């Protein structure tokens, strides 16, 4: 049974009594070397804990009573628990509970999640589901209210639509700590009334607005974006991007996840300059299940920053006090200091981020990489498990692309993927016509793409072509398709594309690979078609099987799943496909597939 977490206002008298020697502590940690994130010092402090919070530090011998648990921390560095300031839990493909099970042993004790993936499928109900689930966990789960649902109104159909009214309502919910990443930076700069209505509702609630400004060359645009009250941004990919954010007073979130490896460049904003690092944050953004198992979570991100030359204490500040101050929770979190929750990591080696024990609310919850506490079981309602609503079963006919009469060859627009890069190239390619149909082709490395509306709406299907996956046969499909998470199918023949799509509709969503009418591998993700409630180890194993099946079909990409999932996100350059058709994202307009 996990202890009840009590607000500071309810325990002030007890904390003061322990600090002044009038009341014994519940727990005392002795002999450790405390990382002081306020001053950057390492101090030989003992720590007294009462009611899950730190009552005092330094010489706390007066707080030791006959019932006090004394923990010997000799040989350990002690630092605050790590806090992820920007994470999409859904990207891990597991629920909040299973995510907590995976990351707590590695030292992550708090997250600030942006649940905009589930919001696009289940709306406010989905956001509330994840927030409520997080309240029952030792991991401290905060959420920012998704701001861009859908990501590109008018170009796609999602399962919900948010505006100022929804944002204002969510700001009153417990656990909502701010506004999620404002991807509609053109709307911010153009003065879009709905966008600024969301900003106004958040600022009126006294909560921060997190950013997503993806125009690195536009400093004046970034300045205008910041003037709207947006206080952080994780879209730095170059040294100068991070520096510009720091210089404008933003929190520069530097990310290292499964698909984004930005720290090598962005950390130079700190290591090659003399700028103050207290507005720098280290975040994960998107981390897949196999990454959580193989390299870890924030422990890996901090380690990478140190490997690139950042002082270990500055790296720790970037996942503790800096994060807490960004979100206005520094009175409770982010430091080993009186009044704060006793979320404490025991490290054998600071530079290697060698975490041996993890304490949350004054209780050791993990040791030696293993979780020591049971997490509550969660029952998900049927509406969450059955979120794939196709207008009708798919047939090969749905994927036919008719050529203009009399044509033997046509020119078509093609999305060309760039490995390890979120962008696509907008190409025009000449392709053959067979029996009146525009066809995919192995020789040209062209696969057909379909985005099928799956939220019970109009059932529309957008069709296009993609180059770069290397498929020789078969088809793959996924309901993880940013950000509206419609049913995304890529294939070399229409029959296999239909089978792939229908397979996912039958299991509530997930990822699948098929060939010649047979399912090669399937990862069910029944929670909104995005997540599994199975342990991360099981999900990672099934995901690996899907990856092997992709390789059997000819794909040689290192990280193909995120590459595919972004094909349908119409806010990224240069060409994307939604259920409504092709979007030229540089001109922000719908375009025809066949050009001549």
From Swiss-Prot:
Cofactor(s) it depends on: Mn(2+)
EC number(s) from the headed UniProt entry: 3.5.4.2
Catalysed reaction equations from the record: adenine + H2O + H(+) = hypoxanthine + NH4(+)
Pfam families tied to this protein: Adenine_deam_C (PF13382), Amidohydro_1 (PF01979)
Top-rank EC class of the record's enzyme: hydrolase
Record bears the keyword Manganese: yes
Keywords recorded for this protein, A-Z: Hydrolase, Manganese
Protein name: Adenine deaminase
InterPro entries, A to Z: Adenine_deam (IPR006679), Adenine_deam_C (IPR026912), Amidohydro-rel (IPR006680), Metal-dep_hydrolase_composite (IPR011059), Metal_Hydrolase (IPR032466)
Annotated organism of origin: Moorella thermoacetica (strain ATCC 39073 / JCM 9320)
Any one of the GO BP annotations: adenine catabolic process
Family in the record: Belongs to the metallo-dependent hydrolases superfamily. Adenine deaminase family.
Molecular function per GO: adenine deaminase activity
Gene name of the encoded protein: ade
């Amino acid at each position: 049974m996990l202890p009840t977490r009590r607000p500071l206002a309810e325990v002030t008298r007890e904390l003061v009594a322990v600090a002044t020697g009038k009341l014994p502590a519940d727990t005392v940690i002795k002999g450790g070397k405390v990382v002081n994130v306020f001053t950057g010092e390492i101090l030989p402090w003992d720590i007294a804990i009462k009611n899950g919070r730190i009552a005092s530090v330094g010489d706390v011998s007066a707080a030791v009573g006959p019932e006090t648990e004394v923990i010997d921390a000799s040989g350990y560095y002690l630092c605050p628990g790590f806090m992820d300031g920007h994470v999409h839990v859904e990207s891990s493909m597991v629920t909040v509970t299973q995510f907590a099970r995976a990351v707590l042993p590695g030292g992550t004790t708090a997250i600030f999640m942006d649940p905009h993936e589930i919001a696009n499928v289940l709306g406010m109900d989905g956001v509330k589901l994840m927030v409520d689930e997080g309240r029952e966990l030792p991991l401290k789960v905060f959420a920012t209210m998704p701001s861009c649902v859908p990501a590109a109104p008018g170009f796609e159909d999602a399962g919900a639509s948010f505006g100022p009214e929804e944002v204002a309502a969510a700001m009153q919910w417990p656990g909502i700590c701010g506004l999620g990443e404002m991807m509609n930076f053109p709307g911010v700069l153009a003065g879009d009334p709905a966008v600024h209505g969301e900003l106004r509702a958040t600022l009126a609630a006294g909560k921060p607005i997190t950013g997503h400004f993806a125009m690195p060359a536009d400093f004046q645009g970034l300045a205008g974006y910041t003037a709207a009250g947006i206080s952080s941004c994780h879209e730095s990919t170059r040294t100068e991007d991070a520096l510009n954010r720091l210089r404008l007073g933003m929190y520069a979130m530097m990310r290292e996840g499964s698909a984004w490896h930005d720290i090598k460049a962005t950390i130079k904003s700190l290591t090659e300059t003399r700028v103050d690092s207290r507005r720098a944050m280290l975040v994960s953004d998107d981390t897949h299940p196999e990454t959580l198992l193989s390299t870890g979570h924030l422990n890996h991100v901090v380690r990478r920053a140190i490997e690139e030359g950042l002082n270990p204490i500055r790296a720790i500040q970037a996942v503790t006090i800096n994060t807490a101050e960004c979100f206005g929770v520094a009175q409770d979190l982010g430091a080993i200091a009186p009044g704060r929750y006793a979320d404490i990591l025991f490290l054998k080696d600071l530079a290697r981020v060698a975490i041996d024990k993890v304490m949350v609310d004054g209780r050791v919850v993990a040791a030696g990489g293993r979780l020591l506490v049971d997490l509550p079981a969660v029952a998900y309602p049927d509406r969450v498990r059955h979120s794939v609503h196709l207008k009708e079963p798919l047939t090969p006919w749905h994927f036919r692309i008719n050529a203009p009469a009399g044509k033997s060859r046509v020119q078509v627009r093609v999305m060309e993927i760039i490995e390890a890069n979120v962008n696509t190239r907008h190409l025009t390619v000449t392709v053959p016509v067979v029996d009146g149909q525009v066809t995919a082709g192995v020789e040209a490395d062209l696969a057909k793409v379909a985005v099928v509306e799956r939220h019970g709406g109009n059932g529309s299907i957008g069709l296009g072509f993609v180059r770069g996956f290397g498929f020789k046969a078969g088809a793959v499909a996924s309901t993880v398709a940013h950000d509206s998470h419609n049913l995304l199918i890529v294939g070399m023949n229409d029959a296999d594309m239909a089978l792939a799509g229908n397979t996912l509709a039958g299991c509530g969503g997930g990822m699948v690979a098929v060939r010649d009418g047979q399912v090669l591998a399937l990862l069910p993700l029944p929670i909104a078609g995005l997540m599994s409630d199975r342990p991360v180890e099981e999900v990672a194993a099934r995901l690996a099987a899907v990856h092997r099946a992709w390789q059997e079909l000819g794909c040689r990409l290192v990280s193909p799943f995120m590459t595919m999932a972004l094909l349908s996100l119409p806010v990224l350059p240069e060409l994307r496909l939604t259920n409504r058709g092709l979007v030229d994202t540089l001109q922000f307009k719908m375009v025809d597939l066949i050009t001549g």
